[in-house]
Amino acid sequence: MGTAGAAMMSSPLAMFTSCAPKEKPCELRISFQEGTAPCKTLEEKLDYMEELGIVGLEPKGKNLAERVNEFQQALRGRNIRISAICAGFSGFILAEDPSVKADFDSSMRDIIAAAGELGSTGVIMVPAFNHQSPCMPHTLETRKYLCEQMHELGEYALKHNTTVILEPLNRKEAHYLRQVADAAAICRDSESAGVKCMGDFWHMKEETSDYAALLSAGTEYLQHVHIASRGTRKMPGEDGELDNYVDGFRALKQLGYDKYVSFECGCNGDKEILVPAAVQLMRTQWEQAL
């Protein structure tokens, strides 16, 4: 073994660093949910977003099929695209009650089809919230069932040129899926290119480091990111020094992440002041993420 090889073997840190992903050129693509901008009508919201350089819009999934034409007309000629679709389905996928599961199946497929018409990156879904019951038990059999169901949804989404996006939550909101790495593993085991996952800066702060969580999904599965302040889930920046996203942004840069980072948060103060400030904070920290 040569001198360089011996040095590498004697330094686990050096070995880890040498295996770290190399940064790929990418830009911060910010998305707003419909309620983020301090405006009333959709046209006013889109005008405001364009002034700030926001390039994505994340609508709610409820009644989305009825709004496809509205969004298509409103976005015509603009540099804004539909990013992900925020849930909006009825029921839930791990419901023990067959009628609740049937509600999920039909409503989710309606949203997926509409998302495809809009060119969306995917429809966000949570397998089960803590308050939803009766729910299938947290067992390997349930995981196998979930992977089978996700495969079917993923293949359906591919037919509509979109995806389904698993969202891990924190333990206060969900007992089943809390780690981005676990969501990525379900994507893998679902064996469908239409099954993806996402990270949420609010939920990740309760469960693991931003950097490790986002890297664990990798370029193959990471399809969307949510952002909010880290103490109260308000506008980024409202919680002062707590609102540090640099490590997570560094991971996104290293992955060459080319999808959206979308606001999912409330606001305690004047949106006219706090929304532009939040956007500037994100852009500043993106540049700091070296």
Question: Which ranges hold each PLM region?
Answer:
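Histidine-acidic metal/acid-base catalytic patches
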Residues: 5-16, 21-31, 39-53, 119-120, ...
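Glycine-rich, proline-tolerant flexible connector loops at the mouths of alpha/beta enzymes
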Residues: 58-76, 127-138
